[in-house]
Amino acid sequence: MTDIAFLGLGNMGGPMAANLLKAGHRVNVFDLQPKAVLGLVEQGAQGADSALQCCEGAEVVISMLPAGQHVESLYLGDDGLLARVAGKPLLIDCSTIAPETARKVAEAAAAKGLTLLDAPVSGGVGGARAGTLSFIVGGPAEGFARARPVLENMGRNIFHAGDHGAGQVAKICNNMLLGILMAGTAEALALGVKNGLDPAVLSEVMKQSSGGNWALNLYNPWPGVMPQAPASNGYAGGFQVRLMNKDLGLALANAQAVQASTPLGALARNLFSLHAQADAEHEGLDFSSIQKLYRGKD
């Protein structure tokens, strides 16, 4: 049993904290939304009135926040956790942020004698609820070894990608490829249907041929082809368009910083941005709704 502080109880953080409780850990929780805290308290967590109070007595601190500026605000500055937290807890940030930001915060932690790992996740809300997330960890090997037993209570695949920031780099590479694959799959399906093909038949042909990919196997973007996919449920739930746009933006910013050529990543970002701008509701839909961009008005 480990004393854990969990900061950020949104769509991902809430279920992750719940799985730590199910595993028998003592979990203190904090979120800016009192309702989110109450939901975890009802499951056995101890609620806190501030991030600092949440971390009192913690052996491990886990944060899951929307963006880099929130991570910097939590950890850095005179009022940040690095300046005020007691003891030597292991710090694990599961937010998806720029690699440069992850390194900046980790270096500040090291200056205080603390270890902060970047550990972004893959698997979406469904994976968070089921405890089957993939964690992609950046940081020293000894920190990874300490974190692994805790992360295994929330995930199925735990990867050590390398030093500080490596987890974030691997995550944005994966999601850039995911965006490219989904856009390409939607484009191919739309072309086939315009020529009179049955999307289910075309999907099966491509699945069993050299065009086979994750989207065709598990997450078909055409409505009605795969009953359990978001596409067959009004594109509700899953990985939202706004989050795909955020991650593609992080990938392109990093590519510019390291002078890497990512023309397909840039095109995917443009396509998802165009999709988001087409209708105010699109940002909240699952990213496979990019199919709508290709279908037009049918």
Curated annotation (Swiss-Prot):
E.C. numbers: 1.1.1.31
Protein residues bound to NAD(+): 2-30, 65-66, 96, 246
Name of the top EC class for this enzyme: oxidoreductase
Domain of life: Bacteria
Protein keywords: Branched-chain amino acid catabolism, NAD, Oxidoreductase
Matching SUPFAM superfamilies: 6-phosphogluconate dehydrogenase C-terminal domain-like, NAD(P)-binding Rossmann-fold domains
Catalysed reactions listed for this entry: 3-hydroxy-2-methylpropanoate + NAD(+) = 2-methyl-3-oxopropanoate + NADH + H(+)
Molecular function GO labels: 3-hydroxyisobutyrate dehydrogenase activity; NAD binding; NADP binding; oxidoreductase activity, acting on the CH-OH group of donors, NAD or NADP as acceptor
Active site: K171
InterPro entries for the chain: 3-OH-isobutyrate_DH-rel_CS, 6-PGluconate_DH-like_C_sf, 6PGD_dom2, 6PGDH_NADP-bd, HIBADH, HIBADH-like_NADP-bd, HIBADH-related, NAD(P)-bd_dom_sf
GO biological process entries: valine catabolic process
Cysteine disulfide links: none
Oxidoreductase is among the record's keywords: yes
Induction: By valine.
UniProt keyword Cell inner membrane, yes or no: no
Pfam families: NAD_binding_11, NAD_binding_2
Gene3D superfamilies to which the protein is assigned, alphabetical: N-(1-d-carboxylethyl)-l-norvaline Dehydrogenase, domain 2, NAD(P)-binding Rossmann-like Domain
Record pathway: Amino-acid degradation; L-valine degradation
PANTHER family: 3-HYDROXYISOBUTYRATE DEHYDROGENASE, MITOCHONDRIAL, 3-HYDROXYISOBUTYRATE DEHYDROGENASE-RELATED
Family stated for the protein in its record: Belongs to the HIBADH-related family.
Protein name: 3-hydroxyisobutyrate dehydrogenase
Source species of the chain: Pseudomonas aeruginosa (strain ATCC 15692 / DSM 22644 / CIP 104116 / JCM 14847 / LMG 12228 / 1C / PRS 101 / PAO1)
